[in-house]
């Protein structure tokens, strides 16, 4: 306790004083020292009952300090939790804004594509009308009346639409067959955890292999595009002029309709040639009869 510490300190001071004092004054100082010791012991005996009060006050201060520290720790923890909650709300708000921005960009892209499709359809319609006007100006085109031409064009369009639908269906079936071949049928009924883990690992390996294939094909396509651009630049250099490549969407329906129209044109040319050859033979026979 503090009382014992004070007594030990006084004893140490007394020993030090005893060592420093001289031999002649030893008796006189001994008597003075004894009286001083008795006085200090009496003071210690009087001050000893006040020690518990001092200890209780120190304990109260220590407890109060501890409570203040705990309150400060709780306040710091609440502040930290509040900051974390604020950060979480801020991240949620940023995520919501990001989703709204992505949705807005997607809607704008869809609107742009829709407008492009409508513009392309209008251009195709204008080009088709121009071609029809040109064909109307020509005489004897296949020997067909305007009604028959319109019916033939309608049939061609129907056939083209059927071909496109069949092609899309065939592509979808081929895609589904390819996916079914890559991912065989499986069942999880009656399997334990080890079997399910092995199944998941097998699917993960398949997925990694397919990702590698996708990466390889994308690299090949990029390489081919680069080679095509390089060859285009070389061709333009040999021509002595540079033509900026125009990237536009290719309408498969238009190309197929052009192909069908070319076939029909060939058939009509064959009929015209056949008709003209018959007329030529008839004229020739008529000329021989007159000569006879």
From Swiss-Prot:
Residues 237-250 are annotated as: Actin-binding. Residues 46-55 have a biased composition (Low complexity). Gene3D superfamilies: 1.20.5.350. It holds the Pfam family Troponin. GO terms for cellular component: troponin complex. One of its GO terms (molecular function) is actin binding. Keywords: Acetylation, Actin-binding, Muscle protein. It comes from the Eukaryota. Residues 1-149, 255-292 are annotated as: Disordered. Belongs to the troponin I family. Troponin I is the inhibitory subunit of troponin, the thin filament regulatory complex which confers calcium-sensitivity to striated muscle actomyosin ATPase activity. PANTHER family: TROPONIN I. This is Troponin I. It comes from Chlamys nipponensis akazara (Akazara scallop).
């Amino acid at each position: 306790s503090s009382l014992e510490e004070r007594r030990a300190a006084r004893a140490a001071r007394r020993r030090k004083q005893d060592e420093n004092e001289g031999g002649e004054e030893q008796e006189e100082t001994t008597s003075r020292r004894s009286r001083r010791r008795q006085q200090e012991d009496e003071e210690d005996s009087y001050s000893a009952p006040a020690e518990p009060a001092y200890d209780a006050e120190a304990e109260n201060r220590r407890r109060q300090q501890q409570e203040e520290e705990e309150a400060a720790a709780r306040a710091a923890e609440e502040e930290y939790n509040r900051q974390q909650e604020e950060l979480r709300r801020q991240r949620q708000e940023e995520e919501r804004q990001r989703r709204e921005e992505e949705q807005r960009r997607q809607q704008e892209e869809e609107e742009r594509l829709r407008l492009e499709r409508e513009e392309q359809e209008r251009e195709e319609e204008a080009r088709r009308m121009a071609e029809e006007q040109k064909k109307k100006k020509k005489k004897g085109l296949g020997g067909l009346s305007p009604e028959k031409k319109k019916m033939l064009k309608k049939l061609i369009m129907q056939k083209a639409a059927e071909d496109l639908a069949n092609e899309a269906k065939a592509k979808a079936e081929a895609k589904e067959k390819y996916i079914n071949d890559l991912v065989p049928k499986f069942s999880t009924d009656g399997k334990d955890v080890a079997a399910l883990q092995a199944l998941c690992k097998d699917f993960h390996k398949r997925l990694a292999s397919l990702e590698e294939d996708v990466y390889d094909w994308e690299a090949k396509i990029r390489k081919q595009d680069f080679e095509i651009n390089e060859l285009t630049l070389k061709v333009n250099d040999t021509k002595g002029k540079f033509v900026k490549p125009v990237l536009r969407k290719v309408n498969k329906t238009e190309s197929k309709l052009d192909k069908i129209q070319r076939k029909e044109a060939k058939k009509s040319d064959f009929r015209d040639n056949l008709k003209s050859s018959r007329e030529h033979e008839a004229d020739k026979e008529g000329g021989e009869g007159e000569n006879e």
